[in-house]
């Protein structure tokens, strides 16, 4: 074979760019909304324009592309819409840091318009990198439909959705206790707050009862908030305080008189059983304040400092105010003590700041009217969630939904489409271009709300905006909405999935997708190195890479699977992996890991393993090409003479049909790891290690007729074309490269259709590319009765021969002589003999009526068939000596343990577990001895 036509080694770099350009140039990614084919659509979870792709992006997009390619080959009109997300807080934060580092300026040093220009510039650069990387991964997106969550179409959809909900009264504005990030100075939704267990203190503070010498003591983790206290609460059933309910106490420093109230929410066992109520700075206190109509006093500024309601502490930070208040309470004799205490502290997922419950006027979506429909979509299976274990999580989220705070105090994002009158409380919600008519007539009297919408508001409309909503006449919307499936990580089941169901169904009264597949989160292996003091640090660099590749760990280094993090040194860059191993190896690795659990342990060595498989695929195909190079497409069109098919041929066709059936089932439930494993095993084990090895003697002319050889070649070409089709959705680059070589080798397909064996392969060859060829279908032949049982016996006969070779320590390169004794299964043995020779390393196999008397042999039995291997004379003496030594050792051991167990003293005084262990040891030794005796007898 010409080296230029088919190089010995596969080089991903030399083919991937050209293959992708061929696909894109040929328009194979573009969907046709007017097509009569059934639709299959996916909208890409848009990556944030904050940087570059990470391994999570590589995973989710590999899985989507696998589905899209599979469905495209099945004849669906597929539409995969790519896009990017503006990611409000995240992008604004990144750009602010960039401007600080590059220009030494803060956001507030710019006008809003100037700052947003910098963000748009960042977005363009980042988006270009991201989209280029998606192409590198092999994503067959419809780039003509590329979207951005702040493009004009998305902006129109967001304003329309806001107005619809506003007009229905679902969107409202009011004071509410929000999660306030004092660094970013914006409200966060509940699910944007991460909770950490932190060590702190529980402070005990006394309040004096008005007109009494009595004091009441409370325990609190936040003494600085006493400046905003509006009540003390106790349980009505707590006898210690029942006489004080209705009395008043004085708040230190601000001298405010506040009531002591009874409330059943108070846990009498916590602290002293009395708690301070600060409705403006604690969520539980806020509920209590609403129930008892208490005043709500905000004591903090937006930056986390004490405001004018803090009296002498005004202007201090939260931390300094706490210290000063404790010192002042001690001076007044009102501080009792402090105790070590661990509590869950809310932290901003973006800035890391401690979240401050903060009374602020915000925009909200009322969720009560959506709760029933959100449940019904999933309970009725209009939306199916995979894995099904996450259904419970979804329903729990829905049952506990709270009104959604949708306003953010940012500059980057969708501006809230509401105008406020400067002179009264009138507001206008407007979803058109420009501004409302009233504003245009009198612009000095109106101002647009300065806040932007939560990123998830626009992301919640993503499936609709991708297909042209609110234009109800959009062909894309009619053809491709609802989408087939949403593929995303389980960590944003509530962040995004639930909100998409809410927002999309509120707009068009249908679900946004039929299925949801939630993949696990990727974990990488990190290594902690401990010093003599027990302190540790993360190993990085070349040492970490050596450990990843299997180097033994020193005693002071411990490996642990952890979420990917730069600080832990366990981040794996997908682009680096593509450069090192090729996109196909990376895709196959990710698919093979995409189990249905919550965690994906991404072992670095898997990339090496699957790169080896890609090479195996190339080399296996190269071998097949060497034997089908004389074939033409016309030969395949003529079909196959099934009378010339042997047991091994029926076996491989049966295995292929079984593969198709299993893979189809796994696609239907998104078991990507099983799809990858089945395809991998079929090519590597069934096709290459078994079938090719069996038919090599025929291919090389050592056995069989010319007609049988021609049949095998046609079958090989057919199998290769079909397996390339099966593998293509996962490893598209190499399969397309090989498919094009097949087309070039076999030539143009004429009008013939082939037969039930070759017909589909002929049909595939007519296609311009593997990615648009029809997906393989079962190959129909007259399978012989008992096929699987017969081939199973052949495999066990081979295993027995290999086992004898191993036990007898025969040279694996030395061809063996074997014989078979079976009077009842002679015909079956006849068809098994070629398989035994090819796979068992046997030179000859004779069918005998009885064992040869003049030979030394070792014997095994399979289903009543005796199979023997002739041993070389010089081997007999060595093997007998070895077995005799082993026999002597076992006999001594058995004698020793038997005497010990016969001792009544040992049986009564020894630990029962030791006695049982000795009995087990004796039984094992006796079994081993019997095996040795049997082997000696066979010699």
Swiss-Prot record:
Its EC number is 6.1.1.9. Residues 874-939 form a coiled coil. GO terms for molecular function: aminoacyl-tRNA deacylase activity; ATP binding; valine-tRNA ligase activity. A motif ('HIGH' region) lies at residues 47-57. ValRS has two distinct active sites: one for aminoacylation and one for editing. The misactivated threonine is translocated from the active site to the editing site. This is Valine--tRNA ligase. It comes from the Bacteria. Catalyzes the attachment of valine to tRNA(Val). As ValRS can inadvertently accommodate and process structurally similar amino acids such as threonine, to avoid such errors, it has a 'posttransfer' editing activity that hydrolyzes mischarged Thr-tRNA(Val) in a tRNA-dependent manner. It holds the Pfam family Anticodon_1. It catalyses: tRNA(Val) + L-valine + ATP = L-valyl-tRNA(Val) + AMP + diphosphate. InterPro entries: aa-tRNA-synth_I_CS, aa-tRNA-synth_Ia, Anticodon_Ia_Val, M/V/L/I-tRNA-synth_anticd-bd, Rossmann-like_a/b/a_fold, tRNA-bd_arm, tRNAsynth_Ia_anticodon-bd, Val-tRNA_synth_C_sf. Belongs to the class-I aminoacyl-tRNA synthetase family. ValS type 1 subfamily. Keywords: Aminoacyl-tRNA synthetase, ATP-binding, Coiled coil, Cytoplasm, Ligase, Nucleotide-binding, Protein biosynthesis. It is found in: Cytoplasm. It comes from Chlamydia trachomatis serovar L2 (strain ATCC VR-902B / DSM 19102 / 434/Bu). It is an enzyme of class 6 (ligase). ATP binds at residue 566. GO terms for cellular component: cytosol. GO terms for biological process: valyl-tRNA aminoacylation.
